[in-house]
Amino acid sequence: MAIPDGTASRTAGTPKCMPVSNPADCFWQEDATELREHRSSEQLPEYSDIVIVGAGFAGLSTAHHLTRDASISKSICILEARGVCSGATGRNGGHCRPDFYGHIPTYMDRAGARAGAEIAEFEIANLRAIKKVIEQEKIDCDFTLTRSMDVWCNEESAKKAEAVYQRMVSENFEYMDDVVFYTGDKVPGICGVKGAIACASFTAGTMWPFKFLMHLTRQLLAAGINLQTYTPVTSVAADSAGDFIIATPRGKMRAGKVVHASNAYASALLPEYGKNIIPCKGICCRIAVPEGDTAPLLNNSYITRTQDNTLSYFVPRPDGSIVVGGAASVFRPFKDQWYDNVDDSVLIDSAKDYYEDYMQRTYSGWEKSGAKISNIWTGVMGYSYDSNPHIGKVPSKDGQFILAGFNGHGMPVIWLAAKELARMVIQGIQFEETKLPRLFQTSQFRIDLAQNGKEEDGDILGTGKFSTTKP
């Protein structure tokens, strides 16, 4: 479609932290439908009971759950700066992989064992809920319930990983029964990774996120939701009647409540989150063998850490190709290329060649496969100062809610998080009445922690040694 009047993402007067208007092509979106650029009406509605900013996983999931209760009749409008699912979810690695033990010990150290376990249990429940809705509604999105392998090729890192595993087992968390940890000479044969010293496996999922969200979009439009793509919100202001004035380059509209679901771009409209949720770029690619050849079989999804501790995540595709990304340690020294950077129109220069011959040098049996990169892209994620998403009522802004800051880990969180946020929006319940992990709650304390703290003490760039004790 031809995008009319003033819908480029960055126009005069728009906030800095806005998506660029020309994102690079991405494998997942090659067969995009017209829904990606849908507008339900030529003009913006004058008023909606609820306006959702962002048509990615968070925004569409929230809208889905808001419409599930047939007894509640609320008008809903979704405003999206670009196309549907054009951000992080539409450009990710295809994983829906709960965190069983990776960051959980950090959360335990900061807030106690139960607080850490809540997150793992929530993410496992999220995976099951996604599986259930996909099966019930017969959604064509290549969903596969699989085993995911964690692999360590560095001896020191392998020992630390085993110690973490033993610690988690000692806590008697029931979900750890699903984890199998391997050490010894048989590890390379078990995981298929050259030089592997230790590996672990547990239940996870892989999927085509863009197709999943296109299904949700069709459902929402059928339910009467008003979707406006290429309509960046430039400001949200309360009026004297208790409503909100939503400004866009296409005009203004009013809303009863506002849900901020723009993830990395949240601070464009909520500047208090400017040091809490930082846009950070990542890199991802699709690798395939020559047409007509058969790729070596890989049944599991992976996170692999090489001998120099470079982490990569990947999922095997039904067509034999691989989607792989990561390599953060390669581009991390070049801060300007990825940190506080919203430009997903260009690759991360320092890492764009990292995945050449990746399968041949990493996985046994791929040496003569001829596998090459067929597509490579970048995306912008919202990383938070303390590694937890911000969910709930925006402090000191009644009627505004946030669901953002997923740290590149939104797939295992968003579906059920959006369900609980929808309850807060519709039923008026407090965060403490939801099923959300306590550490996910946005708060003035967390906002102040990042605003008043040092960048180098936060989790994104630094040591994570900030104070976590409330005064």
Where are these predicted regions, by residue range?
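A conserved short coil-to-beta-strand element within the FAD-binding core of flavoproteins
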Residues: 181-190, 225-244
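Glycine-rich FAD pyrophosphate-binding loop
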Residues: 67-91
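Rossmann-like flavin
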Residues: 107-219
